[in-house]
Curated annotation (Swiss-Prot):
NCBIfam families: PRK00143.1, trmU. It catalyses: S-sulfanyl-L-cysteinyl-[protein] + uridine(34) in tRNA + AH2 + ATP = 2-thiouridine(34) in tRNA + L-cysteinyl-[protein] + A + AMP + diphosphate + H(+). ATP binds at A16, M17, S18, G19, G20, V21, D22, S23, L42, G135. Disulfide bonds join C111-C210. This is tRNA-specific 2-thiouridylase MnmA. HAMAP family: tRNA_thiouridyl_MnmA. Keywords: ATP-binding, Cytoplasm, Disulfide bond, Nucleotide-binding, RNA-binding, Transferase, tRNA processing, tRNA-binding. Its main location: cytoplasm. The record marks H136, Q349 as: Interaction with tRNA.
């Protein structure tokens, strides 16, 4: 069966333009491919002046202006759509609630699922567009029978398929990723932008969480949830330190622990468990982080759901590596067993399954199994 990247026919494309170089080049490539492209910048902050500190953050008035200038150079219509309230409800408040519950969310996945390929896509389809184009590094491969598959980018070093693993068949059918099927370095993308006359060619990349411009996640959460002093305990339950809010930690964390009593072996301690119920954080040795299996909920499939147990590779973080697993859907939940123990797996994170380069689907980690103990 033959396969081709993306789609050959001319489409009405809505290009999401963040004001950065990747989305600008993606829009330019879509237009160059012959599609009827319109640019749109998403206003996601009620206070856009506070969304950037240096190279951090995004979604500012400056970004909107950069996106408009890029659209003018490309020669496409351009609009700004205000989705700030939807973003606050579906991404920011979800982020806060997940941390408050002791879990570790990924707001980029949630934004793709709820904003770019839901709120934006729905509005685009209602206006007669065929597809939404973004600057993500991933590939949509169309099989001979018309089936669309999400694959890793040709350049594995820049692959972003993990944060797109939440897309279902309907969303994937209207997704366009012009950057994903070529092996190019970021310097080459910037050089292409410069050749095209795009002023964003030298604009720094944004980093970290877009709505936490200074990168201080704990400070952001403390401002929203307030300080709540509690104990840091070791595996025996002995108090070894204190904290100002259990919500400010994540499984596997080492830095920022206020521990007054050193470990008997003198080795570093890591966060093993977070209990919002009694506001305690449990710490222990690195070896205690070894996870052999996990259960994940709310699975979303890029194609048909697996009908039985299978062998896959799994990715657990946006910039994490692959690991071999067996996985099976049991009573609507994904049961995953690792071929070798892995560390730093936190409830709330997404597990994305791959068959080679193809994204099979994703689910949200609910519990993990370490040796003989399940952690929720």
């Amino acid at each position: 069966m033959t396969e081709t990247p993306q789609r050959p026919r001319r489409l009405r494309v809505l290009a999401a333009m963040s004001g950065g170089v990747d989305s600008a080049v993606a829009a330019a490539r879509a237009a160059e491919a012959g599609h009827d492209v319109t640019g749109v910048h998403l206003a996601l902050s009620a206070n856009p002046q506070s969304f950037r500190t240096g190279a951090r953050g995004c979604c500012t008035i400056e970004d909107s202006r950069d996106a408009r200038r890029a659209a003018d150079v490309i020669g496409i219509p351009f609009y700004v759509w205000d989705l700030a309230e939807r973003f606050r409800e579906d991404v920011v408040e979800d982020f806060i609630a997940e941390y408050e519950a002791g879990r570790t969310p990924n707001p980029c996945l949630r934004c793709n699922e709820k904003i770019k390929f839901a709120a934006l896509l729905d509005k685009a389809l209602a206006l007669g567009f065929d597809a939404v184009c973004t600057g993500h590094y991933a590939q949509v491969i169309v099989r001979e029978d018309g089936t669309r598959e999400l694959h890793r980018a040709s350049d594995m070093a820049k692959d972003q398929s993990y944060v797109l693993g939440v897309l279902d068949d309907r969303q994937l059918a209207h997704a366009l990723f012009p950057l994903g099927d070529t092996v190019t370095t970021k310097d080459e993308i910037r050089a292409e932008a410069e050749r095209r006359g795009l002023a964003v060619a030298k604009k720094p990349d944004s980093h970290d969480i877009c709505f936490i411009a200074d990168g201080d996640t704990q400070g952001f959460l403390a401002n929203r949830l307030g300080k709540a002093e509690g104990d840091i305990v070791d595996e025996s339950g002995s108090v070894v330190g204190s904290h100002e809010g259990a919500y400010g930690f994540t499984i596997g964390q080492r830095k920022g622990l206020r521990i007054g009593t050193p470990a008997p072996d003198g080795k570093p301690r890591y966060v093993l468990d977070i209990s919002p119920v009694d506001n305690t954080v449990t710490v222990g040795p690195a070896a205690a982080l070894d996870v052999t299996a996990l259960t994940a909920i709310k699975p979303r499939w890029c194609g048909a759901a697996p009908t039985g147990p299978g062998t896959y590779t799994a990715q657990l973080r946006a910039h994490g590596g692959e690991t071999q697993v067996t996985a099976e859907l049991v009573d609507g939940e994904l049961q995953v067993t690792f071929a070798e123990p892995v560390r730093g797996v936190a409830p709330g994170q997404a597990v994305v399954l791959y068959d080679g380069t193809r994204v099979v689907g994703s689910a949200t980690i609910a519990t993990t199994t370490r040796t003989a103990t399940a952690v929720a």
